[in-house]
């Protein structure tokens, strides 16, 4: 250090330490990439028709921010007819994803027509839709029949159950009653219907069989950034 001022020596030491630190610790942006990136899974989007019925009377008071009625529970059976959709590069157009919420379990049904890649994609999406299940969750495969008409809807999920409903017509007796922005399902407009019969029974202990219960029919458009689905 002979011939150098104390100030120049201090700056040299500081610069040396700074270079060592730069090469030793990763940049903040790199650390961010490590913790985010694709950790949340593939990007996805699905849109189409939602067909649903539950054990509540018409109208289901859950759709208006209240508890179930006239019983203390609300068990539901529904299906998503995916008219356009993808999970990453996997196309999901024309497939269906059905589900039920019961006393003993929640069960997802993958369309039996799905390829192995599509089935994995639908299972992954199902996991995103149901974020905080309160009961056990199962995933199975089934033939799903979903029909949407001008005066009613119909759903059959394999041998497990289904329903048929007629839309509730308004005062003009021509157009159905519609509820906008309901509190249960993320669909802009929900056509209200009444089931002729809603029945379901599975191997997990869920069972219900009722008549004249609530039904909803509407369009959905969900993706991996949608804040809430139902």
Which positions does each model-derived feature cover?
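N-terminal secretory signal peptides that target proteins for export/translocation
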Residues: 1-6
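N-terminal low-complexity, Pro/Thr/Ser-rich intrinsically disordered segments
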Residues: 32-46
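Bacterial N-terminal signal peptides
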Residues: 11-21
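Beta-strand-enriched cores of mature, soluble protein domains
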Residues: 42-230
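Signal peptide processing junction and immediate N-terminal pro/mature segment
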Residues: 22-33
